[in-house]
Design a protein with these regions (language model features):
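Signature of N-terminal electron-transfer/Fe-S-associated modules in redox systems
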Residues: 1-155
Length: 155
């Protein structure tokens, strides 16, 4: 049975009517029309669907709407703006990371939460924080450089 959910996404309030077990990802993409996060695997194994829920990265493909509650959801679109991009977004461009771009959502959202809480991370800590994310284009070295650059920018 469908239920009404009040969602705060990227600072704006929305109402969605859906099954409580429906993944947050579907509400974001289908009901709210956001083009990120992406559907990758549907099993929380690739990270393309990562969003922040109350500041913590979650895989929205397996997060039911009923688990969101009054939480605040931030997607990649809410992390920065074209006028004032998040340091990770700037670093990704400067390091020329994007190829196909499909996985960027997961990498940036995961790294943003990590860097917020870890001001001067080691390379090993960065690698550990990004464990479980997938990039089919194989840009892992460039991604690591971008996260290190962003850490310096945010330092």
């Amino acid at each position: 049975m469908n239920k009404q959910f009040s969602l705060n996404v990227n600072g704006k309030d929305h109402t969605v009517e859906a099954d409580p077990d429906m993944p947050l990802l579907y509400a974001l993409r289908d009901d709210l029309g956001l083009n990120n996060p992406h559907f990758g695997c549907g099993l929380a194994q690739c990270g393309a669907c990562t969003v922040h829920l109350d500041g913590q990265p979650v895989r929205s493909c397996v997060t039911p709407l009923s688990a969101v509650g009054n939480g605040k959801v931030v997607t990649l679109a809410g992390l920065g703006t074209p006028e004032k991009p998040h340091p990770l977004q700037t670093a990704y461009v400067e390091e020329e990371v994007p190829q196909c771009g499909y996985c960027i959502n997961g990498w940036i959202m995961t790294a943003a939460a990590f860097l917020r809480d870890n001001k001067k991370p080691t390379e090993a800590q960065i690698k550990e924080s990004l464990t479980g994310l997938k990039c089919r284009c194989g840009t892992h070295i460039s991604i690591l450089r971008a996260v290190k650059r962003a850490a310096t920018m945010m330092g």
